[in-house]
Amino acid sequence: MEAISHTKGSRRASKGMLFVGMLILLAMLLAACGGTTAGGTTPTPNPATPTVAPPTDLITPGTLTVGSDTTYPPQEFVDPTTGQATGFDIDLITAMAQSMGLKATIVKANFNTIVDDLVAKRYDVVISAQTINDERKKKVDFVPYFSAGESLLVAQGNPMNLKTVSDLCGLAVGVQDGTVELDDLNTASKACTAAGKQAIKLTILKDQTDVIQLLVNKRVVATYQDSPVTDYYIKLNPGQFETGGSVVNAAAEGISVRKGDTSMFNAIQAAFQRMRSNGTYDSLFTKWQLNASQKISLGDRRTIYTS
């Protein structure tokens, strides 16, 4: 498989990049204000009286330290004007922390190492659009909070008629490192070569925002990511992008906790249930214009993922 690596410093800003950036900024300004600083400080007010018992073992007393790859709108991204993390996931975990009488500090993480960093106690928990799968469950436990599938983002009109990953043989495609989408593209590429076709020409980048920029700059013909991300960029750029084919591989995403940290797991589960029952969860879906089918219900059999 062909893999092309790029660094941020090697790329020059384009009109397309500025257009996407302006629209993202506009969307954030229209959304309700709030968020947590990506690098550390939390400008949120003092938490109210706890309604959920807080965990007993925190990295910093009084603070829930949260790892998140803040390059994945609409779930987690950074407001360029304030440097604060924002998005559905950020709002949710901040409200959950407040229900435990804690402040939330969001630490920008590398998605490719985020699980190992949690195990190494760099964070108390991780919320970062993590699909729950068997490989990750070997290292951490999950409290599901969201459901998402995978989809292709292509140029408006879908000029190459791309419907599934099997249509990508020999084509340039962008994807974020460490994701289930990368795994699926690797599998599809092997199927291409087994059928006597060219491998998929993958450009694998660390940040999802940079992956989308590849499509803006016409360096790839498609990108592959979680369906909410695809939907988000289509909404931000009317007439520029569309979904290629259907959403596939719908699966739960979870807030991850170190194995054996029963106090943290129970607190996160109880706090999420609180958000689900008091209307906060539903209000955040409305705020971020998410699809109701992506909700995880209190009665969902996937409420706990441990092994």
Spans of model-derived segments:
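Bacterial lipoprotein signal-peptidase II cleavage site
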Residues: 33-43
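Extracytoplasmic small-molecule ligand-binding "clamshell" domains
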Residues: 47-129
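Bilobed "Venus flytrap"/periplasmic-binding protein-like clamshell domains
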Residues: 68-73, 85-98, 130, 151-207, ...
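Periplasmic-binding protein-like
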Residues: 70, 147-156, 227, 235-272, ...
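Extended ligand-binding regions for polar small-molecule ligands
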Residues: 90-99, 158, 166-172, 177-179, ...
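Acidic, polar ligand-binding/catalytic clefts
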Residues: 94, 103-167
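A ligand-binding cleft/hinge motif common to bilobed small-molecule-binding domains
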Residues: 112-113, 130-138, 185-188, 216-249
